[in-house]
Structures are given as C-alpha cells and as structure tokens.
Regions:
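Helix-enriched interaction subdomains in cytosolic or periplasmic regions
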Residues: 2-8
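A residue-level marker of the well-folded mature domains of exported/periplasmic proteins
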Residues: 3, 13, 19-314
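Sec-dependent N-terminal signal peptides
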Residues: 8-14
Length: 314
C-alpha cells in the first residue's frame, strides 16, 4: 500500500524508455551535479544515492557529484557555477529559493546543461519532479484534526520557504480551516528543516502556549526535534504530524513519542525519475508534462509495520 503504485508504474515506463534511449542516444550521460538543501538530512542523501544509482545504470562510468547548499542561495549559485565549469551534462537542483535561483538555471542551460528541479520547483528548470506537497500537508493535517476530534489549539511549525514547504503549509491550512473548533495559534516560526531547529521552535511554542494540543511540522527532522523539546519540558498529550516518512519517523511511530503520523515521500523514486527525465531531455525527448508529481501516503502507528520506507533501493 506504500508503493505509490500509479506513480511507480509511470517510473517503470520511464525506466524502460530511458534504457531504450540509452542504446540509440547520440549524447551520453557522463556526469551529473546535484545540489540539495542539506546533506545532513537523510532524505537528501537518499535523493543523491538514488540519482547516482540510476545514472550508473545508464552509464556505469557516469560521475555524480552531490553537494549541500545548506539553504544558502549564494552558496548554491557558486555550486552551480562549479558544475558549469566541470561541464556536467545534467544538474539536479533542490533550490534554496525557487524564484531567485533562475539566473543560475539560465546560465547552466546556456552552457548546454539540462536542469531538473527535484523536491521543490525552480524557475526556468527544464522539468520538475516532486511530491504532491499540497496533498502531503492535507493528509497529515486531516489526521491531526480527526485525532483531536475537530477541536483544540494547533500550531504549524514552518520551515525554509521553498515551494515544497509552502505547499505543505497551504494544504494543512486548507484542512484546518474546515474545522471551526481548531484554533491555529501560530504558523510563522521557521524550524529550519532540521532536528535542532524543530527543537528550538518547539521550546519557544511550549513556553509561549500553556495549552497546546497539536503540531504539524513541515518535515520529519523537525517533528523529532519537537518531540524531544516536549519531553525536556515534560509536556504530554500533544499530537505531532509531519511529512517525509523518514527512517527516524518510523522509529518514532513505533516508540513512546508524541509523533502520530507522517505523509511519506519517495526520494529514491523521485531521484531516479529526475535522472530519467533529464536524460530524455538531453536527447530531445521532452516530457508531456514538465511537472511530475509523486503522490504521498500517510504512515501512522497503525500501519507503520507494513511501510517499506525509502532508505533502500527499489
């Protein structure tokens, strides 16, 4: 049930297409540059590994270089410049700022490089492969609202303002707005997409709000950090939901934590699809739709044992 069946069927077709194209293509895939938000996040590590695995299926000698932008736009500009200087064939881009990154995207394309946005949109990219993040936010917050019986004090622990985070928050807000008994206390604190950031943001919330019933965090590292903060302050009875389906959240859902659900992503499949699409574009095969969405699935304490996870190849 967690195989993202419809999407994976499409990916299987794309794999077959790309493999066939590899035999006839007049432009080989020799190198890929990958720049992501943070290689301290296992999610982005999985993206890098998935992309490398697919690239080496196409060409065993392909060189794949992955770097961490740390959500720093200027740093990412420099990384893209370095990829251009290295004459990579393709860049997989997890943009620090989806709009401001456009000049770097255009510069890479002018150098003959195909740019595929991964996980978040990037202005000017040849194509984008990402989770349906609006749906991910909706799933997590629908669970949260139902768990609270449609009433209570809730916060949205925000994060870096990339398109994926904005979409998740918008999806969550849409669901919460349908529950008049739920009071949204705050949605503007940046948990920085990390465990430490989530813990710091949650400590502030717990100090500020003596009664807190539910928390939606924009990713799993923030959820784990928020749970740690609640433990440190001996706060119980809070429902935490998030997005990712990371290994740490599997552990949290099986243990004694406040985390109750996470909308899963599939970074391995996302990365493989991104390489497929980019390789096709390199050889004149543009996708029918440049925005490719992978549907999320909700993991809870009730079904986590059957969840296959995304840390292993598939």
């Amino acid at each position: 049930m967690f195989k993202h069946q419809a999407v994976l069927t499409g990916i299987a077709c794309a794999l077959a297409f790309a493999t066939a194209a590899a035999h006839a293509a007049d432009k080989p895939l020799k190198s890929i540059g990958i720049t992501v938000g943070s290689l301290g996040n296992p999610y982005f590590v999985t993206i890098a590994r998935g992309a490398e695995a697919r690239a080496k299926q196409i060409n065993p000698g392909a060189k794949v270089t992955a770097v961490s932008a740390d959500y720093d736009l200027n740093k990412q500009f420099t990384q893209i410049d370095n990829f251009i200087s290295a004459h990579v064939d393709m860049i997989l881009l997890n943009a620090a700022d989806p709009k401001a990154i456009e000049p770097a995207v255009k510069k890479a394309q002018a150098a003959g490089i195909t740019v595929i946005a991964v996980d978040v949109a990037a202005a000017g990219a040849n194509a984008t492969v990402q989770t349906n993040n609006v749906k991910a936010g909706e799933l997590a917050c629908d669970f949260l609202a139902k768990k609270l019986g449609g009433k209570g004090n809730v916060i949205i622990e925000n994060g870096p303002q990339v398109s994926a985070v904005v979409d998740r928050v918008n999806g969550c807000k849409t669901v919460l707005a349908k529950n008049p008994g739920i009071k949204l206390l705050s949605a503007d604190q940046d948990g920085k997409g990390s465990r430490e950031g989530g813990m710091n943001a949650m400590q502030g919330y717990l100090t500020r709000f003596p009664k807190l019933d539910g928390v939606f965090t924009i990713n799993d590292p923030q959820a784990v950090g928020s749970d740690l903060a609640a433990k440190q302050l001996s706060r119980t009875g809070i429902v935490i939901t998030s997005v990712d389906g990371a290994p740490d959240i599997e552990t949290a859902l099986k243990g004694n934590t406040l985390v109750q659900a996470s909308s899963s992503q599939d970074p391995w499949a996302m990365a493989q699809q991104a390489v497929n699409v980019g390789y096709g574009i390199m050889n004149g095969q543009k996708p029918a739709n440049p925005m490719i969405l992978i549907e999320p699935a909700l993991i809870t304490r009730d079904n986590v044992k059957s969840y296959k996870g995304w840390s292993a190849p598939h």
